[in-house]
Amino acid sequence: MDKRTVVTAVLCAAAALGASAAVAELAPPPEASAPVRAKAAQPSTSSQASPRAQEARPQLSAAPGSTLPPAVTPPPGGPAAFTGALFTDGLDSDHFCTATVVQSPGRNLIVTAGHCLMDGDQSDGTAVFAPAYANGVAPYGTWKIQQVYEDDRWAEGTDDDFDLAFARLAPDDRGRAVEDVTGAAVLDTTGRAGEEVTVTGYPADRKVPRTCTAVAVRESATQQRFDCADFPGGTSGSAWIARDGKIIGVLTGGDTDDVSTSTVLGDYAASLFAKATAGAKAASPAGR
């Protein structure tokens, strides 16, 4: 079962002849015995999304006929450019988690939460990453997920202290690596926690990202907490970026939409990143 409260109510359906209420979806009821903390939204039937990421269906908040502000393309090299949404099957499908481009020799890696994706080869899947996505537009394009790397303690045992994943992306239609287009953030795996961080995530019920800055709190040797209102399902995988621009956490869950958690990125994250880097570099188009 997921780690975030699963939506169980039905939204009001749009009334005929001019009503502008949102179209309703019915989400599957949660199992009574399971914890409810995940912030991943259900991505329909894609083989690339993990079971936890499939349990809370997104509900679009924009009413039929409503207008949204135009998308603005952020300049490359900043978080607004290299942070994006994960989609099950192109931009016409649901977005269910958030991911961030991370600097790597192959220039083709993103980091997200482990419960967002399935470990292993995903070359036959359909999930894509859309950096800087907003209002139905992906200004930089989309990149297909090829391979997912997770710690065995998460992939086989779902230990929350290891809820982290890296994904290798295929080149886009023009043969470009994602980092060459959007820029990327540096991953810090020295175990930093309890610092001011800025977090950008994609709520599943919206078509624009949500950003907040606050001071994280170290909860234990392996967990840290970030208190900021309105980080619901879909924001799983959001990078916690410190003031020096480095990623020191990745949003994995929270008991409410106002409390978010991350593992402390220590030795296990360094080992996993090394594994992903080796695989991604070997598979990069230029062999870099």
Predicted regions and their residues:
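N-terminal low-complexity, Pro/Thr-rich disordered segments
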Residues: K3-C12, L17-L86, L265-R288
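Conserved catalytic-core segment of clan PA serine endopeptidases
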Residues: P69-A81, F87-G90, A127-R174
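Catalytic histidine site
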Residues: P76-Y133, A216-S220, T252
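Structural recognition of the beta-strand scaffold that forms the well-ordered cores
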Residues: A85, L109-V111, A165-R168, T198-V199, ...
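Solvent-exposed loop/turn segments at secondary-structure junctions
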Residues: D92-S93, G106-R107, C116-D119, N135-V137, ...
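Terminal interaction modules at protein C-ends
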Residues: Y133, A155, D255, L272-G279
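Chymotrypsin/trypsin-fold serine protease catalytic domain
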Residues: I145, D160-A229
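Catalytic nucleophile loop of clan PA
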Residues: D230-L251
